[in-house]
Structures are given as C-alpha cells and as structure tokens.
C-alpha cells in the first residue's frame, strides 16, 4: 500500500493526485479538482515544512528527485483517514445545505428551533 505523498512539478506549479489530493485538502484547504490539487512553486517550502511537521513521507519529482522517509513514524495512512473523513463530513454538510435552501422560511424557522 502507498505510504508517501507524490508531488510532481509541472512548469510553475506542483501537483498531487488522488489520495494525496485529499491529504492536501486536509492540511492546506486546497481545492480538489478532478482528484488533483495544484499549488504554485512559491508555496513549496510551506508544503514541505507542513509535511515534515506532520511526519508524512513524501517524494518530489521536479528538477531532481527528493525523498523523505520517516520510516515507522510516518503518519501518511492516519492523515489520509482523517482527510477522507473530513471530505465525507463536508460533502454531507453540502447535501444538508442544499436541502435547507429548498425550504420555505417557515420550515427553516422550525428546523432552527429544533437545532437550538
């Protein structure tokens, strides 16, 4: 099973894909588009520092290949689980919000009174 974030350089941006995109959404609030997250070269140091703070293995494929392996301290899998949970909760909140937007004012008042 995969245990490292793979970061690919493409011009003036870096990209991560699939599960790694969820991790980046969780750590940096970057938007996921088509299972991909991109960030500018200027954010590279911030990204690497955050991955190291969270002891997440990574591989950077850019001008040169850079690898960081935290061995048994690696938290890739745990952070991925948290990332997927966060995504699931936010998607559920979007569904709820969509339903709330369709309610009449009176129905909204009832919902709010129940929640309070």
Model-derived regions: residue spans:
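Basic, polar low-complexity surface loops/patches
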Residues: 1-116
